[in-house]
């Protein structure tokens, strides 16, 4: 779609569907200038991704409630819409009309700024999530690095809201969130670095393209099993999901940094945490599970069926399967995250930091070194 | 050197063990997903309170002799017995009687000691109110009988404790239409009636008739 930076897509992958080009061509057919067509096009993918993110959150909340219920031999939401699908919508509506409370001796400005600072980077990170060769807002050259740097803005917001609440539980929750995010960012970045080293690019599109050669066999999970585990554990810690939900541990800290929040500000935290979960799942599928790639390469399928990859219908089907595959993989991971939530007990803060600094960090370093060695030894298999 | 290697080996073994345990745990939670729900869908389904359930207290004004035993045995002297001495008949005349269920602990001592059995326990437990003073029941309110779970047409009565049908051990894939184990009070009554009819005709067949009635109930 919109490409601010030059894409260096490998020549062997077909350019696929380019909606922006077709759209601009249509508008230019109406006599608009190139610039005007671009200006009209710009907000469309952004809006689309924003809506997709919010719908993704609604689905995730519903899934979380239904799967949690099933794991505990309950039924879960049932009466709001068929099978309770409208329950998250009802929850959101409730939060929207609730009173907006700022505690008496809290810092009003920071208290308001906190949730915004938590949500904005997470939504901004959707910029780099590809659903197809050209189906992303911006193929930024530094793609995955942008996500890592954006996700380190989040703890500042958490710390801010925890400190501004003028509440000891909030402060402790905020501090824990900051400590957790900082200690898990490093192994996360190292795990990503190993993938980046193999695909020779930080761009998410290139990372996926590099995994599309032989379908499921070329997915990074086979070449980076340790990296996959490190990334998934760190992603769970970054999302503050159980077993790493210390910042909001109900039994100890009421609700952590969210304690004093109500109404729309609380909804922002809630939205942020679930968007972050979906985003992390999407990025795991992009980095390790072949992104939009079908288990069998679409090019092969088209070849067996005697169709050209460039035929319009094939392109549309390829695009659709791309979106479905990305979402499917992401939601499989979301399911695992929800199941893990009811399987694992919460770790203690010392165990959390131990795991981060003494286990994941050395392991990620070793993984990086081994990847580098393998890349030098077998450049064919490890993207030399 | 070997010490270091041993450390690394132990560490690896621990990590592998942790992974195995985690997988085992995930298998357990995954296995729970397709089981029959244990929950009672409350406003639509209700558990039948047990026989000697201590719910809201029922009181019969006409039986009461204003002896105030209930007040004496009550841990906090809760019942308010408002009576006056009629000088002419030399008898107590009861005016009002009330119990505040916002304070009552439902110990049942008053019911136990009432000499005329004018106090009794009901199976009513839905005592939520917007104002705690509305829980102070006077003799009129105390005389009302609650709607029974088994006769309320809006409620599906459920037997307590067992959530699986009789004879079922595996909670997986149980048909949702099959009821829980145990008979509902009306089924118990009908089987008793059948039993009585069978025993009047033939003493020897009473056992089989019990069996058939049980079978039909399930």
Curated annotation (Swiss-Prot), chain B:
Ranges of residues in domain 4Fe-4S ferredoxin-type: 55-84, 95-124
Keywords of this entry: 4Fe-4S, Iron, Iron-sulfur, Membrane, Metal-binding, NAD, NADP, Plastoquinone, Quinone, Repeat, Thylakoid, Translocase
Protein name: NAD(P)H-quinone oxidoreductase subunit I
The protein's required cofactors: [4Fe-4S] cluster
Keyword set includes Thylakoid: yes
Root EC class: translocase
GO cellular component, one term: plasma membrane-derived thylakoid membrane
Family per record: Belongs to the complex I 23 kDa subunit family.
GO terms for biological process, alphabetical: photosynthesis, light reaction
Record field: catalytic activity: a plastoquinone + NADH + (n+1) H(+)(in) = a plastoquinol + NAD(+) + n H(+)(out); a plastoquinone + NADPH + (n+1) H(+)(in) = a plastoquinol + NADP(+) + n H(+)(out)
Residues given in the record as [4Fe-4S] cluster 2 binding sites: 74, 104, 107, 110
Segments of skewed composition (Polar residues): 208-218
């Amino acid at each position: 779609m919109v490409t601010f930076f030059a894409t260096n897509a490998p020549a062997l992958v077909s350019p696929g569907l380019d909606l922006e080009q077709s759209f601009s061509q249509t508008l230019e057919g109406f006599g608009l200038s190139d610039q005007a067509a671009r200006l009209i096009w710009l907000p469309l993918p952004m809006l689309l991704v924003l809506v997709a993110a919010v719908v993704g959150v609604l689905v995730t909340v519903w899934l979380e409630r239904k799967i949690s219920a099933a794991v505990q031999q309950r039924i879960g939401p049932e009466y709001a819409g068929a099978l309770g699908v409208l329950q998250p919508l009802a929850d959101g509506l409730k939060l929207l009309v609730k009173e907006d409370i700022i505690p008496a001796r809290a810092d009003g400005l920071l208290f308001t700024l906190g949730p915004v600072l938590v949500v904005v980077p997470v939504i901004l990170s959707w910029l780099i999530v590809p659903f197809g060769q050209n189906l992303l807002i911006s193929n930024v050259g530094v793609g995955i690095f942008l996500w890592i740097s954006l996700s380190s803005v989040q703890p500042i917001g958490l710390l801010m809201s925890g400190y501004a609440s003028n509440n000891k539980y909030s402060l402790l929750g905020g501090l824990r969130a900051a400590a957790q995010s900082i200690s898990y960012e490093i192994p996360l970045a190292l795990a990503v670095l190993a993938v980046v080293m193999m695909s020779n690019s930080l761009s998410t599109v290139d990372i996926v393209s590099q995994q599309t050669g032989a379908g499921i066999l070329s997915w990074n999970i086979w070449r980076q099993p340790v990296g996959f585990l490190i990334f998934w554990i760190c992603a769970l810690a970054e999302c503050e999901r159980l077993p790493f939900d210390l910042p909001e541990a109900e039994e100890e800290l009421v609700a952590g940094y969210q304690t004093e929040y109500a109404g729309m500000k609380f909804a922002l935290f809630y939205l942020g945490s679930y968007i972050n979960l979906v985003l992390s799942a999407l990025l795991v599928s992009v980095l390790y599970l072949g992104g939009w790639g079908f288990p069998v390469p679409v090019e092969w399928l088209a070849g067996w069926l005697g169709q050209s990859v460039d035929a319009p219908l094939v392109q549309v089907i390829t695009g659709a399967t791309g979106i479905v595959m990305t979402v499917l993989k992401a939601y499989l991971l979301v399911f695992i995250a929800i199941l893990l939530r009811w399987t694992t007990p919460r770790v203690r803060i010392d165990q959390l930091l131990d795991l981060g600094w003494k286990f994941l960090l050395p392991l990620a370093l070793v993984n990086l070194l081994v990847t580098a060695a393998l890349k030098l030894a077998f450049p064919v298999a490890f993207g030399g | 050197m070997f010490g270091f290697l041993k450390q690394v080996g132990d560490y690896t073994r621990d990590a592998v063990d942790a992974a195995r345990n985690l997988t085992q745990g995930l298998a357990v939670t995954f296995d729970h997903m397709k089981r029959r729900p244990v929950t009672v869908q409350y406003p639509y389904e209700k558990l039948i309170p047990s026989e000697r359930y201590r719910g809201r207290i029922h009181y019969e004004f006409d039986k009461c002799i204003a002896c105030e035993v209930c007040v004496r045995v009550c841990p906090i002297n809760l019942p308010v017995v408002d009576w006056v001495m009629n000088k002419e008949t030399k008898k107590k005349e009861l005016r009002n009687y009330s119990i505040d269920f916002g304070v009552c602990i439902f110990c049942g001592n008053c019911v136990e000691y009432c000499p005329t059995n004018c106090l009794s326990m009901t199976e009513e437990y839905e005592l939520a109110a917007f104002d705690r003073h509305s829980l102070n029941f006077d003799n009129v309110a105390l005389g009302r009988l609650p709607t029974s779970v088994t006769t309320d047409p809006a409620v599906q009565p459920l037997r307590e404790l067992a959530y699986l049908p009789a004879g079922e051990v595996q909670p997986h894939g149980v048909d949702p239409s099959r009821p829980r184990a145990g008979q509902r009070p009306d089924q118990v009554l009908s089987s008793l009636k059948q039993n009585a009819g069978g025993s009047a005709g033939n003493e020897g067949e009473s056992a089989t008739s019990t069996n058939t009635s049980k079978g039909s109930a399930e």
